[in-house]
Amino acid sequence: MRSLDAARDTCERLHPGLIKALEELPLLEREAEGSPVLDIFRAHGGAGLLVPSAYGGHGADALDAVRVTRALGACSPSLAAAATMHNFTAAMLFALTDRVIPPTDEQKKLLARVAPEGMLLASGWAEGRTQQDILNPSVKATPVDDGFILNGSKKPCSLSRSMDILTASVILPDETGQQSLAVPLIMADSPGISVHPFWESPVLAGSQSNEVRLKDVHVPEKLIIRGTPDDPGRLDDLQTATFVWFELLITSAYVGAASALTELVMERDRGSVTDRAALGIQLESAVGLTEGVARAVRDGVFGEEAVAAALTARFAVQKTLAAISDQAIELLGGIAFIKSPELAYLSSALHPLAFHPPGRTSSSPHLVEYFSGGPLEI
């Protein structure tokens, strides 16, 4: 398929050999619990996609990022979901370094290791809870000498067994005593961090979405990124940008899975040409929406406009994916469905987009307010 080939070409340019290495494993092995896809991703430079070139990464723009994610989703939906968590976290952390005055030496040294060493970033935020903000604090921090003690849990937490750094959002007092959002950088091997089984579905099991618990985990002050008196709103601004990255990338991951199903229909000439054209139109409308927002972000659209565009695309695509699944499975036929468990898997793998925050119900009043000329508050 033309547009999927373009996505694969982008992935090959930025992560040479990654798709080929993944395809050496059967789909269901790629998707299973204990799958090596994250090791393969790490070995082929996957960690550096959104890391700036100054830190040894690719510094990819939004369009390249959604295309890479789509290519991964067509090959391994589990990996695409996990890669989204790493990449949107990287996008936020490295955006923060541009506005920290100055970043601590420890922060710079740690972030400079991400791309060269293939360090994977997990997020301790709310991306698995539909009706919440993705950056809703999920960890409590207690001040101690030289830092804070963190307690809490995140479930599900993708990359739980492969992460090198866990990030979280916490509410801490600033120099004036005001409560503000801060982001601690927590080494995954810190005493007090443990991983526990949580994900029981076979769908997306390869994303390692288990429970991560923090019990009396010490994080030094020098590894806490927080607001500054001369720029108190910087974290709020960056939350908006991070929100857009998350929605674009997670949508692209599921568009990739839909692309794999559609490609099978095209390759097997299933149904009439009119049927295949209708399916292709459904898919390409989802691709066009996602890539259109990515182009806008690349070209400078930001703030409320970018958030509204990303959410509009995400919810429109979410509805389209269900139609693509139904139509593709019908065209591929009952015998194919019975004989090929991969088809049932791919069809099921399109639906979890609806479970990522924010939920359509909770977002609706805010979108209506924005569509009617008011501000957008998510």
From Swiss-Prot:
Keywords (A to Z) from UniProt: Antibiotic biosynthesis, FAD, Flavoprotein, FMN, Oxidoreductase
SUPFAM superfamilies: Acyl-CoA dehydrogenase C-terminal domain-like, Acyl-CoA dehydrogenase NM domain-like
Keyword Transport applies: no
InterPro entries: Acyl-CoA_Oxase/DH_mid-dom_sf, AcylCo_DH-like_C, AcylCoA_DH/ox_N, AcylCoA_DH/ox_N_sf, AcylCoA_DH/oxidase_NM_dom_sf
A Gene Ontology BP annotation from the UniProt entry: antibiotic biosynthetic process
Regulation of its function: Inhibited by 5',5'-dithio-bis(2-nitrobenzoic acid) (DTNB) and 4-(hydroxymercuri)benzoic acid (p-HMB).
Record-listed E.C. numbers: 1.14.14.30
The reaction(s) this protein catalyses: 2-methylpropan-1-amine + FADH2 + O2 = N-(2-methylpropyl)hydroxylamine + FAD + H2O + 2 H(+); 2-methylpropan-1-amine + FMNH2 + O2 = N-(2-methylpropyl)hydroxylamine + FMN + H2O + 2 H(+)
Gene3D superfamilies: Acyl-CoA dehydrogenase/oxidase, N-terminal domain (1.10.540.10), Butyryl-CoA Dehydrogenase, subunit A, domain 2 (2.40.110.10)
Source superkingdom: Bacteria
UniProt GO MF annotations: acyl-CoA dehydrogenase activity; flavin adenine dinucleotide binding
Assembly information from the UniProt record: Exists in dimeric or trimeric form depending upon buffer conditions. It can form an isobutylamine N-hydroxylase two component enzyme system formed of a flavin reductase component (VlmR) and a monooxygenase component (VlmH).
PANTHER family found in the cross-reference section: ACYL-COA DEHYDROGENASE, ACYL-COA DEHYDROGENASE FADE28
Function of the protein: Involved in the biosynthesis of the azoxy antibiotic valanimycin, which has an antitumor activity. Catalyzes the oxidation of isobutylamine to isobutylhydroxylamine via the formation of a flavin 4a-hydroperoxide. Unlike other known N-hydroxylases, isobutylamine N-hydroxylase cannot carry out the reduction of the flavin cofactor and requires the NADPH-flavin oxidoreductase VlmR. Also able to oxidize propan-1-amine, butan-1-amine, butan-2-amine and benzylamine. It has a similar activity with either FMNH(2) or FADH(2).
Designated name of the protein: Isobutylamine N-hydroxylase
Organism of this sequence: Streptomyces viridifaciens
Protein's gene: vlmH
